[in-house]
């Protein structure tokens, strides 16, 4: 059976105060066309449907239109809520949607029942695992000892009976250890929300959401499809796409990606004011793109933002890179260091190196060690 795997639609998102709704509607039309071209037989949507727990009316209408068009194609749709979504709002009307072959993960209550579909190779079980926090699993199983995301997801999966003799597909929205991240994602401090890819060993394909760059983790069949659009300038080098996954006989999974072409790209450009405003500089590019411009002029250009927007109307961000800004940056960094104690600096270094903060015991040990060093000097 051939599926399209998409995730992290973030409908209603604003980037630097620019609404992305028009761009999202454009890319959704493209996705619908790809579904027809690729002869897709089912659609997997791995969470973060909306950008906010309480989406705007326009965002809800756009997703309603998208789902309605999918349902009109008589395709089964499988979707879960992500960390940006409201579980209760997204699950509203789930029983009614089933009649249109749209399967929505309910608010997590400890039960995850497979949805069985059939094709020429037999039965295929689809499991919908919505975004889980330790508190969600603890609420469903008060007796369980759960302190981490790893323990929460592991416990939730242990309550599922998986028949490994048939094909099994999982749709999930978590941060799997090893994923490359970018600025537009919301992750827990210190890597506390990491889970291991090995938790999904029983599944033939794991359709992941949460991470915005397309990538696989440890093996090709544990995959983040990425966002359909760029949502921050840390994503400028991403090649956005949809993932097409075909599960044939047990053990045979074929993966391809189909590129998505946005209405407006997100790009960075750099140069002097005269360079970036020269017609020869921009005449072969889309001036409607969302831009981050860095000017290298030594002197500030009066009303640079307004002037540049006469050429690049969707200029989102403007900054300078010159001798003055580099000196100021160096002074700021030195000033910050001078104001901090050796213990503060060591704590920052430890956090940077280990991606987690020091414990109270470690803090006390370093503090005592520093005091001893000062006494011996």
Predicted regions and their residues:
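A short helix->loop->beta-strand "cap" motif at the edges of active sites that frequently abuts
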Residues: 72-77, 166
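Accessory, non-catalytic peripheral segments of nucleic-acid enzymes
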Residues: 37, 42, 247-377
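Glycine-rich phosphate-binding loop signature in dinucleotide/nucleotide-binding domains
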Residues: 35-39, 119-120, 162-165, 285-286
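A conserved active-site cap/scaffold subdomain adjacent to cofactor or substrate pockets
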Residues: 197, 204-262
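His/Asp/Glu-rich metal-coordinating catalytic cores
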Residues: 55, 84-218
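Short beta-strand segments at enzyme active-site cores
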Residues: 41-47, 79-81, 167-171
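Divalent metal-coordination and catalytic microenvironments
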Residues: 8, 28, 48, 63, ...
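N-terminal active-site segment of His-dependent metallophosphoesterases
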Residues: 1-68, 72, 363-372, 376
């Amino acid at each position: 059976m051939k599926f399209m795997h998409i995730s992290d639609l973030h409908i209603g998102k604003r980037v630097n105060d620019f609404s992305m709704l028009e761009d999202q509607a454009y890319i959704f039309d493209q996705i619908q066309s790809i579904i027809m071209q690729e002869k897709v037989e089912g659609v997997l949507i791995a969470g973060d449907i909306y950008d906010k727990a309480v989406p705007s009316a326009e965002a809800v209408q756009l997703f309603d239109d998208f789902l309605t068009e999918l349902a009109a194609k008589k395709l089964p749709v499988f979707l879960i809520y992500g960390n940006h979504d409201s579980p209760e709002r997204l699950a509203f009307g789930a029983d009614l949607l089933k009649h249109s072959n749209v399967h929505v993960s309910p608010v997590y209550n400890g039960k995850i029942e497979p949805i069985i579909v059939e094709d020429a190779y037999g039965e295929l079980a689809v499991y919908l695992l919505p975004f889980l926090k330790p508190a969600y699993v603890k609420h469903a199983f008060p007796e369980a000892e759960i302190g981490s995301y790893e323990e929460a997801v592991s416990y939730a999966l242990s309550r599922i009976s998986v028949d490994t003799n048939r094909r099994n597909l999982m749709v999930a929205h978590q941060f799997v250890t090893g994923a490359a991240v970018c600025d537009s994602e919301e992750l827990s401090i210190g890597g506390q929300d990491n889970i291991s890819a090995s938790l999904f060993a029983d599944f033939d394909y794991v359709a992941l959401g949460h991470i915005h760059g397309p990538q696989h983790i440890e093996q090709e069949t544990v995959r983040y499809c990425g966002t359909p659009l760029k949502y921050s300038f840390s994503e400028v080098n991403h090649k956005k796409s949809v993932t097409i996954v075909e599960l044939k006989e047990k053990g045979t999974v074929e993966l391809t990606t189909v590129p998505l072409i946005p209405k407006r790209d997100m790009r960075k450009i750099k140069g002097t004011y005269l360079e970036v405003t020269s017609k020869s500089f921009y005449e072969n590019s889309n001036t409607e793109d969302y831009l981050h411009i860095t000017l290298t002029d030594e002197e500030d250009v009066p009303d640079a933002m307004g002037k540049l927007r006469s050429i690049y109307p969707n200029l989102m961000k403007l900054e300078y890179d010159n001798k003055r800004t580099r000196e100021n940056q160096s002074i700021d960094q030195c000033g910050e260091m001078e104001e901090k104690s050796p213990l503060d600096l060591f704590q920052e270094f430890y956090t940077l190196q280990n991606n987690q903060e020091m414990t109270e015991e470690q803090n006390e040990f370093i503090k005592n060690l520093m005091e001893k060093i000062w006494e011996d000097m």
